[in-house]
Amino acid sequence: MTQHFIVIGNPIAHSKSPEIHTLFGAHAGLDICYQCQYCPDDPASFTAVIEAFFHGGGVGANVTVPFKQVAYECCAARGGLSEHAKIAGAVNTLSLNQALLASGVSRAEALYGDNTDGQGLVNHMQRLGWPLNGARIAIIGAGGAARGVVLPLIEAGIEALTIANRTLSKATELVNELSTASVVIHNQQIQTCCTADLSGDFDIIVNATSIGLSGETLPLADELNCQYAYDMMYGRELPFLQHFAARGAQTSDGYGMLIGQAALSFECWTGHAIDVTQATAALEKSSI
């Protein structure tokens, strides 16, 4: 029997998730169908689409921008959340709480949320050989994408973290939530600032906004420098990476992170572990 999966987002046409998960399914010997699902940018539409998908027999769903926080709220009121999702306040992987289903709860009310983004990012940076232990890191953005990666980066041993956002209050809100959850870096306060005010030298700067997908540029200060620049988006030329490459930084888009978080989601849904290095090589070969 075919198992059905989706990735829901807006925009979504650029997503490579169907290609990745189809490869995973073939490697695991499973018959799967994984499709992109566009959704209007409002919570009611997201909820309606997800409920219809799972009610119709769907097995699992990935969530991308701009719905990760909406997905969190949906799961918090229904089937529950993993610890990483709770701390992040964002969900990128939806499945069904099997215990609740067994108790007679409807599929729509058994939605369970996890967040594999952060571990996918950390795993990719480690495969690239980027030093995380003791690193000084800045994250641009304070939405669902940023929320998902903060805790895994801290767990990887970073030394200091600055969260920059166009609206300072949103960055401050994220830090306050992390403080409430007792997330600290060596008992140091996580710093915040407006994106335009972010300056100084960092080991790694991560763009966790989707602004590059539209070809727009971030308001980056001339005094902002790094050794490594990472954009969580992928699939096209990204101004953020071009900016730091011109300054001599090593750069990477988020395709490797996508593969890593996808492997964790796939294992959550099917129980099959994926060799990410092998899968990445196969995907790169197929795209030549």
From Swiss-Prot:
<dbReference type="InterPro" id="IPR006151">
    <property type="entry name" value="Shikm_DH/Glu-tRNA_Rdtase"/>
</dbReference>
<feature type="binding site">
    <location>
        <position position="92"/>
    </location>
    <ligand>
        <name>shikimate</name>
    </ligand>
</feature>
<dbReference type="Pfam" id="PF01488">
    <property type="entry name" value="Shikimate_DH"/>
</dbReference>
<dbReference type="GO" id="GO:0005829">
    <property type="term" value="C:cytosol"/>
</dbReference>
<dbReference type="GO" id="GO:0004764">
    <property type="term" value="F:shikimate 3-dehydrogenase (NADP+) activity"/>
</dbReference>
<dbReference type="InterPro" id="IPR041121">
    <property type="entry name" value="SDH_C"/>
</dbReference>
<comment type="pathway">
    <text>Metabolic intermediate biosynthesis; chorismate biosynthesis; chorismate from D-erythrose 4-phosphate and phosphoenolpyruvate: step 4/7.</text>
</comment>
<comment type="similarity">
    <text>Belongs to the shikimate dehydrogenase family.</text>
</comment>
<feature type="binding site">
    <location>
        <position position="232"/>
    </location>
    <ligand>
        <name>NADP(+)</name>
    </ligand>
</feature>
<feature type="binding site">
    <location>
        <position position="64"/>
    </location>
    <ligand>
        <name>shikimate</name>
    </ligand>
</feature>
<protein>
    <recommendedName>
        <fullName>Shikimate dehydrogenase (NADP(+))</fullName>
        <ecNumber>1.1.1.25</ecNumber>
    </recommendedName>
</protein>
<feature type="binding site">
    <location>
        <position position="254"/>
    </location>
    <ligand>
        <name>NADP(+)</name>
    </ligand>
</feature>
<feature type="binding site">
    <location>
        <begin position="15"/>
        <end position="17"/>
    </location>
    <ligand>
        <name>shikimate</name>
    </ligand>
</feature>
<dbReference type="GO" id="GO:0009073">
    <property type="term" value="P:aromatic amino acid family biosynthetic process"/>
</dbReference>
<dbReference type="InterPro" id="IPR011342">
    <property type="entry name" value="Shikimate_DH"/>
</dbReference>
<dbReference type="Pfam" id="PF18317">
    <property type="entry name" value="SDH_C"/>
</dbReference>
<keyword id="KW-0560">Oxidoreductase</keyword>
<feature type="binding site">
    <location>
        <position position="83"/>
    </location>
    <ligand>
        <name>NADP(+)</name>
    </ligand>
</feature>
<feature type="binding site">
    <location>
        <begin position="165"/>
        <end position="170"/>
    </location>
    <ligand>
        <name>NADP(+)</name>
    </ligand>
</feature>
<dbReference type="GO" id="GO:0008652">
    <property type="term" value="P:amino acid biosynthetic process"/>
</dbReference>
<keyword id="KW-0521">NADP</keyword>
<dbReference type="GO" id="GO:0009423">
    <property type="term" value="P:chorismate biosynthetic process"/>
</dbReference>
<feature type="binding site">
    <location>
        <position position="234"/>
    </location>
    <ligand>
        <name>shikimate</name>
    </ligand>
</feature>
<dbReference type="InterPro" id="IPR046346">
    <property type="entry name" value="Aminoacid_DH-like_N_sf"/>
</dbReference>
<dbReference type="GO" id="GO:0050661">
    <property type="term" value="F:NADP binding"/>
</dbReference>
<comment type="function">
    <text>Involved in the biosynthesis of the chorismate, which leads to the biosynthesis of aromatic amino acids. Catalyzes the reversible NADPH linked reduction of 3-dehydroshikimate (DHSA) to yield shikimate (SA).</text>
</comment>
<keyword id="KW-0028">Amino-acid biosynthesis</keyword>
<keyword id="KW-0057">Aromatic amino acid biosynthesis</keyword>
<dbReference type="Pfam" id="PF08501">
    <property type="entry name" value="Shikimate_dh_N"/>
</dbReference>
<feature type="binding site">
    <location>
        <position position="117"/>
    </location>
    <ligand>
        <name>shikimate</name>
    </ligand>
</feature>
<dbReference type="InterPro" id="IPR036291">
    <property type="entry name" value="NAD(P)-bd_dom_sf"/>
</dbReference>
<feature type="active site" description="Proton acceptor">
    <location>
        <position position="68"/>
    </location>
</feature>
<comment type="subunit">
    <text>Homodimer.</text>
</comment>
<dbReference type="InterPro" id="IPR022893">
    <property type="entry name" value="Shikimate_DH_fam"/>
</dbReference>
<feature type="binding site">
    <location>
        <begin position="141"/>
        <end position="145"/>
    </location>
    <ligand>
        <name>NADP(+)</name>
    </ligand>
</feature>
<dbReference type="GO" id="GO:0019632">
    <property type="term" value="P:shikimate metabolic process"/>
</dbReference>
<dbReference type="InterPro" id="IPR013708">
    <property type="entry name" value="Shikimate_DH-bd_N"/>
</dbReference>
